[in-house]
């Protein structure tokens, strides 16, 4: 009787169901009789509706399907021989030790009087399947996450969220954001905004279909111009702003401006774009490609607008050279096209005229007033009033960093950046918060901290409901759910979700240790390591055990030590 119960299928997926007690102890006829009995009880695995018709017999070990019991029996003999862990009681073999241990509890609990008894609480059951389900109740108490609505417990939070959506849906008052189109309600505002994009796309399709009407097949015939020719030349019109396009793909790409959709993502940094040309132009930053060369000087540019801005420098230089002839140079005769036109004298070279009496001192033709932009950048065409501003700007193109930190040797392109960096070593924090008194080394950090005192948190994560005061914090937090890691180390290829983690990781390759201990000569790459190290110098405030008097450097070691006294 016991051996026959061991051959029953184990419910709920705790162990694989079995059809044979040994590799070669039963014939196909015996197996067929046993299978018919199991089918009458409704416990056969082959009766599952999820299995393919015609191949209803499945192996309990490798999950393969077979058209008949004989083929399954022949396969099971070979499959069981490969399983490494046999049961000493009935000969059944298992692939994993936990399944064998659970199976042996069935033999230990089976008695002729009480049936199957639980070895934890002593409760007895008629069948071993009920015992296995009961053992699951004991293991459920070890699960750390409990449902707040019922007594069920889970190993992971995503299992709890799925359980809450399925068994405990939120009440209507807990979902205050209602869609005006379909009446669907949401708990978070961001979820409603994302849902409304579906209706926007549908409305655009319907409006475009009504405006255009049924279009004839084939290429339209060329007709004479008629009123409303723009509608003929640009038949595809946006239903939101009225802008018209010649081709439907252009309209589809334009509609993403209204819907907020950005389907084109950069594989290097994760930034998203509405159109593929924007992505192509952006990727040149990573590849270093510069396809637009200057015909005058040969300098290459990444984007065409930068080339056009740069070409103006050559035009201005040519114009100034033509407008400023030498003092003794002869006057060239004007060409046939230039003779009728009046020459345009340059303003700086034109002699100043005497102002009429009563004229204001700021006369437009006053030669003393120079143009505001005197110094232009040869790379991008930007102009500056002072030469030092131009030199500071040109460091962005050349990569020059003349300001070096005396503590760690790090270089900077601007002196203000060096001053802000030096506060890391000195510990100076001149910017203080008026609300809580907290101090910061940079003004931008203080400005970001002041928003923490604001009562509202408008940016809500649609996955877990966590709220943030700043949109970049929400974007960085959402990478936890999406698993996106856009920041890649160029030395080893390891990827990170936060840029600060990449900066901290790169110190492993560079050997940089910016955090130095003021009490000794040691330095550290992480600030947390410096804080832990400095506790070793603080002997007066060390963590002391009140029972034996032993001291420790940190509180965690003291708590671990005190557990020995509790035992």
UniProtKB/Swiss-Prot annotation:
Listed Pro residues bias regions: 345-362
Ranges of compositional bias, category Basic residues: 305-315
GO annotation, cellular component aspect: chromosome; cytosol; nuclear membrane; nucleoplasm
Chain intervals with Polar residues compositional bias: 22-50
Residues bearing the modification Phosphoserine: 27
Induction data: Expression is increased in bone tissue of osteoporosis patients.
Subunit structure: Homodimers and homomultimers. Found in a complex with RIP60 and RIP100.
This protein's name: DNA-binding protein REPIN1
Species: Homo sapiens (Human)
Lineage: Eukaryota, Metazoa, Chordata, Craniata, Vertebrata
């Amino acid at each position: 009787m016991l051996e026959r119960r061991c051959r029953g299928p184990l419910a709920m997926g705790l162990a694989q169901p079995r059809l044979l007690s040994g590799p070669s102890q039963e014939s196909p006829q015996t197996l067929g009789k046993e299978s018919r009995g199991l089918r009458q009880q409704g416990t056969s695995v082959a009766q599952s509706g999820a299995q393919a018709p015609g191949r209803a017999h499945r192996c309990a070990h490798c999950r393969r399907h077979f058209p008949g019991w004989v083929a399954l029996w022949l396969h099971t003999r070979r499959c069981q021989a490969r399983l490494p862990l046999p049961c000493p009681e009935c000969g059944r073999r298992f692939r994993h030790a936990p399944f064998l241990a659970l199976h042996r509890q069935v033999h230990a609990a089976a008695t002729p009087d009480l049936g199957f008894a639980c070895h934890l609480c002593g409760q007895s059951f008629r069948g071993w399947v009920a015992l296995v389900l009961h053992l699951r109740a004991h293991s459920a108490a070890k699960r750390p996450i409990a449902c707040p609505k019922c007594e069920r417990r889970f190993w992971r939070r995503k299992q709890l969220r799925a359980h809450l959506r399925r068994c405990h849906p939120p009440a209507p008052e807990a979902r205050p954001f209602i869609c005006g189109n379909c009446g669907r309600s949401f708990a978070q505002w961001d979820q409603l905004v994302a849902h409304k994009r579906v209706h926007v796309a549908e409305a655009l399709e319907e409006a475009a279909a009504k405006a255009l009407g049924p279009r004839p097949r084939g290429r339209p015939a060329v007709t004479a111009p008629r009123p409303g020719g723009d509608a003929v030349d640009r038949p595809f019109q946006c239903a939101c702003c009225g802008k018209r396009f010649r081709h439907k793909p252009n309209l589809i790409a334009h509609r993403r401006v209204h819907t907020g959709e950005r389907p084109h993502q950069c594989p290097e940094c994760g930034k998203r774009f509405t159109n593929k040309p924007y992505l192509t132009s952006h990727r040149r930053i990573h590849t270093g490609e510069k396809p637009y060369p200057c015909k005058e000087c040969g300098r290459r540019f990444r984007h065409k607008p930068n080339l056009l801005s740069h070409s103006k420098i050559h035009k201005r230089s040519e114009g100034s050279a033509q407008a400023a002839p030498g003092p003794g140079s002869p006057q060239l005769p004007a060409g046939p096209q230039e003779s009728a036109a009046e020459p345009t004298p340059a303003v700086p070279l034109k002699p100043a005229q005497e102002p009429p009496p009563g004229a204001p001192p700021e006369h437009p033709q006053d030669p003393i007033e120079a143009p505001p932009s005197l110094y232009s950048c040869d790379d991008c065409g930007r102009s500056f009033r002072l030469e030092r501003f131009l030199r500071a700007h040109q460091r962005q193109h050349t990569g020059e960093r003349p300001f070096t930190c005396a503590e760690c040797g790090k270089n900077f392109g601007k002196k203000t950046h060096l001053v802000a960096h030096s506060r890391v070593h000195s510990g100076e924090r001149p910017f203080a918060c008026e609300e809580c008194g907290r101090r910061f080394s940079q003004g931008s950090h203080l400005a970001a901290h002041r928003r923490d005192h604001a009562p509202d948190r408008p940016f809500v994560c649609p996955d877990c409901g966590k709220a943030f005061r700043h949109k970049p914090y929400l974007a960085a937090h959402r990478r936890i759910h999406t698993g996106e890691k856009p920041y890649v180390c160029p030395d080893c290829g390891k990827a990170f979700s936060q840029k600060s983690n990449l900066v901290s990781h790169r110190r492993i390759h560079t050997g940089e240790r910016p955090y130095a201990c003021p009490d000794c000569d040691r330095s550290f790459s992480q600030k947390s390591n410096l804080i832990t190290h400095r506790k070793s110098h603080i002997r007066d405030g060390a963590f002391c055990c009140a029972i034996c008097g032993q001291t420790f450097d940190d509180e965690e070691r003291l708590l671990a030590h005190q557990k020995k006294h509790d035992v």
